[in-house]
Amino acid sequence: NEDGPLSIDYLKKKLQKTKKNNLPKAIIAVHIAGLPCDMEELHKLKKKYKFKIIEDASHALGASIKSKKIGSCNYSDFCIFSFHAIKSITTGEGGCITTNNKKNYHRLCQLRSHGIIRDKNLLKTKNLSKYHWYYEVNEISFNFRLTDFQSALGISQIKKLKKFIGLRTQIASYYLKKIDKKKFILPKIYKDKKSAWHLFIIKPKNNINRSNLYNYLKRKGIVTVLHYIPIFKHPYYKKKIKNQERLINSINYFQQALSIPIYPNLNKKKQNYIIKTLNNY
């Protein structure tokens, strides 16, 4: 939709037109900029069309829907978080997957460490399960383990997450109040959803050229980012993805979207400078 997350109305139309044997096995709901998708409606479609839901919550740690935190998997099968260096909390690199399904949990534990199984209840060779040292590999996987050092770094920051999200929310509220709405389309606020405000994405109005605006802000010392180049525009995927014209929403969004600075220690003086510079354009 216009905010970036998956359009439920568009998805409904696509699912209705899709033949039964071609229905998707899974839908990835991307909570772009930290704003949750409409997970309740998506869950209704999941029950009707029998697909899995994977939440991409790389931006959304600390976000919530009706006071329920993203990652609780109330509407999904899996939820994925990123702990990359620029995320709300970081372990340098890495991330985590949450699920509230026991079967999925045991499968993830197996896949994260070379496919190794140590749980006696899951071992196939039962006569050896009595030995404490015994383990099995029943399928190929890789080493996806986060180190103890990285984990300790992440855990130490979780205590600060509420503060980090609070500061981002204050900055976002100030931007929403002060940036000229006649010149820019600003993010929407929803009663039942709380954004983590990983990004603050604006879209220029009145035929303001986004590239010219980007260059203007750069000259003024304000770093902005274009989020994100559609996957099918990258050379490798151009050959893989056909009928790109059907992905017009991705193209339109990318051509308009511009992320302005938002991070916990962005002080009021810098916020005012960003607002003034934008409004004077």
What are these regions (language model features)?
Residues D3-T91, C96-N104, S259:
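Active-site phosphate-binding strand-loop segment of PLP-dependent enzymes
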Residues I8, I155, K268-I275:
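Short, amphipathic alpha-helical "lid/cap" segments that border enzyme active or binding sites
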Residues K14, D38-Y49, Y174-K178, Y216, ...:
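Alpha-helical structural signal in soluble globular domains
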Residues A60, S67-S76, Y131-N138, I189, ...:
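Active-site-adjacent capping/gating segments
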Residues A60-S67, Y75-L199, F232:
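Active-site region of PLP-dependent enzymes
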Residues K102, K205-I208:
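Helix N-cap motif at beta-to-alpha junctions
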Residues L108, S211-K220, I274-N279:
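Short amphipathic alpha-helices in soluble, non-transmembrane regions
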Residues H114-K130, Y174, K178, N212-E245, ...:
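Conserved PLP cofactor-binding pocket of PLP-dependent enzymes
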